[in-house]
Amino acid sequence: MDHLMLRPVYKVKNLDTLNNIYHSYYRKITTGIKFFVFKKGPLAVGASYLCGFIKSDHHLETPNLQFHVSPASTDFLGKTTLHNFPAFTPTITNLRPTSRGTVEIQSPDTRIAPKIQMNYLSTDEDKEMACKAIKITRNIVMNSKAFKKYEPEELRPGIHIIDNGTLAKEAGKYANTIFHPVSTCRMGNDEMAVVNDKLVAHDLENLRIVDASIMPHITSGNTNAPTVMIAEKAADMIIEDSKS
């Protein structure tokens, strides 16, 4: 399992974004100096300037969508440069996906990479939630007073796309992992489980797995803090076992 981030992009006016800085040689230099001398400016901030959790339906007890907002935009993360116009990306993620991927061993030779199939947006529930998430984002950006002075224009997927089938397909074209893969060595006692409740691998001795892969299900949020907690719990269990 993994969290998939949908990446709608909005062009704006009357607003400076990281796109402007990236395409200005002078501003890149001054931005670098500002960071090295004062530890301030865009380089002192992470990739997301704003994070928030919301509910796709007010009947839900807890939020099921997460925003990561970046004052920059690009076509594909890590493959293309920032756009040459001011824009921002209100990335939104379904925190409870139902799509399941697979990891299959291809050979006894450890030098042969496994076959990894992520299967993003492979269920009707995830496709429906992707459409709902995009429409919620669109409503916030296009209809709220806070954004009005910036005259937002939906560059991607495009304000004209309202059909759910087309919207889910377009949203998936530019989606990316948010780097939360879990559950490949999940804890449990069924035939698909890899470790027991002590994090010891089934049918093996002296082998524990201590990372996000042991989670039976993905968490409704970032996975780093829960993984640290898993490690701390595992450390306690290892110490306790060493005494016996």
Question: What positions do the PLM features span?
Answer:
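Mid-to-C-terminal "cap/lid" subdomains and adjacent gly/pro-rich loops that border
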Residues: 1-84, 139-146, 161-165, 169-173, ...
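Short, glycine/acidic-rich hinge or "gate" loops at secondary-structure transitions
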Residues: 148-159
